[in-house]
């Protein structure tokens, strides 16, 4: 039930609008903290899609740790918790994707016994849910063992809704999917649905960059292709002061400007688009910073011959695989003067040690700016992996748990899982 001393107005005006519009009203959003769960059962959609090794042991528990605060809040209120999640992409019921493999890890992290039921709907699930006492946690079997989950089936969602009194969405990683457990189920909790603490913080962090940022704002966009970042580039031009371009897409811009890029990655059909983006940025007084030099190699290998060359003077037979030393200095200077920083995508092929220095130097610059008071948000699978690999996880303000979901928010798109709570 809602706490009587907390005012939590509903979003009565939402249908299909951009994320960038409604997150401006972030302080009106109902979260877990707006409810008292005493004697109540919280049905929480979490994202426990974690990596497992060959022995079915969790190798990265970040997503489980991220969900802990929401679970503990319910338990401390005197409520019980029913957790639902997916794991991998099973085709039907496959043991390797069973969530029973992660029960011990969830139990270890939360600090209380975690019960498990080998189904997520039906008599077994209902009975297990009914037997829950205050302070207990139940983990349901993999939602994707049923095709109805990804189809957004209403009947399946209705069965899920029978397992709890209050619906909580705390799975940012799947918020961009209109699945039964992330979107459809919310309709069965018209007055008893809210955001989990993790999902709220994700929205809050992105909002801080897009709509409530302290200037100057710098966005760092890396990755292989311009085509994968068009939406982001278009949406943030009105919101940032600087855009740093890195990764493979650098060379599409460089070639569009007439540079010689050798065998570097390029999207030939996006050269005009690259020029258009540069023109739009100039018209909006947004400075785009391209790498001025690169570590080039004669093969895509740690054993390749390498040298440092200007990005527009790469000869045939050589390819740019990382940013150079002058670029590191230029980018660090821009970042040091920034008050808000968004990092989405690495600058080079950091997975190969020989081409990781540009990404490491970028991480150092962001970490230093953060220690000096800047707000820094890191998101996107590869950049998050880089942050973890090089030890920057605790040196930035926030590391997002959602790759595709964050990208769609940065593009200004509405996310079904978020709209379902707001509507």
Segments predicted by a language model, with ranges:
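Positively charged N-terminal leader segments that act as targeting/secretion signals
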Residues: 1-11
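Active-site loop-to-helix "anion-binding N-cap" substructures in soluble metabolic enzymes
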Residues: 26-423
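Short, Lys/Arg-enriched N-terminal segments with co-localized hydrophobic residues
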Residues: 11-28
């Amino acid at each position: 039930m809602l706490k009587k001393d907390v005012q939590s107005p509903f979003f009565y005006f939402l249908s299909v609008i951009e994320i960038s519009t409604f997150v401006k009203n972030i302080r009106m959003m109902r979260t877990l903290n707006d409810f008292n769960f005493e004697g109540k059962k919280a049905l929480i959609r979490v994202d426990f899609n974690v990596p497992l090794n060959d022995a079915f042991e969790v190798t990265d528990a970040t997503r489980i740790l991220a969900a802990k605060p929401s679970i503990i809040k319910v338990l401390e209120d005197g409520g019980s918790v029913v957790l639902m999640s997916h794991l991998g992409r099973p085709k039907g019921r496959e043991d390797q994707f069973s969530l029973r493999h992660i029960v011990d890890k969830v139990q270890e992290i939360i600090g209380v016994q975690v019960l498990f039921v080998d189904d997520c709907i039906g008599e077994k699930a209902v009975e297990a849910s009914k037997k829950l006492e205050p302070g207990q946690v139940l983990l349901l079997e993999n939602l994707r063992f049923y095709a109805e989950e990804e189809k957004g089936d209403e009947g399946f969602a209705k069965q899920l809704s029978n397992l709890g009194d209050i619906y909580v969405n705390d799975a940012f990683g799947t918020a961009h999917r209109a699945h039964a457990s992330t979107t459809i189920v919310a309709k069965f909790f018209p007055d008893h649905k809210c955001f989990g603490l993790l999902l709220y913080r994700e929205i809050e962090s992105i909002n801080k960059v897009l709509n409530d940022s302290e200037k100057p704002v710098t966005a760092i966009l890396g990755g292989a292709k311009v085509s994968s970042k068009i939406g982001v580039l278009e949406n943030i031009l009105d919101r940032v002061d600087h855009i740093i371009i890195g990764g493979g897409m650098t060379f599409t811009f460089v070639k569009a400007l007439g540079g010689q890029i050798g065998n570097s990655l390029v999207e030939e059909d996006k050269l005009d688009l690259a020029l258009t983006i540069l023109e739009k940025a100039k018209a909006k007084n947004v400075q785009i910073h391209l790498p001025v030099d690169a570590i080039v190699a004669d093969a895509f290998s740690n054993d390749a011959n390498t040298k440092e060359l200007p990005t527009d003077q790469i000869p045939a037979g050589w390819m740019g695989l990382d940013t150079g030393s002058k670029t590191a200095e230029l980018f660090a200077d821009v970042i040091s003067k920034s008050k808000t920083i968004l990092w989405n995508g690495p600058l080079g092929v950091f997975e190969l040690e020989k081409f990781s220095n540009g990404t490491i130097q970028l991480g150092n610059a962001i970490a230093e700016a953060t220690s000096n008071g800047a707000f820094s948000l890191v998101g996107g699978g590869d950049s998050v992996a880089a942050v973890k690999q090089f030890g920057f996880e605790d040196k930035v303000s926030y590391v997002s748990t959602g790759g595709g979901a964050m990208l769609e928010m940065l593009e200004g798109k509405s996310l079904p899982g978020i709209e379902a709570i707001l509507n």
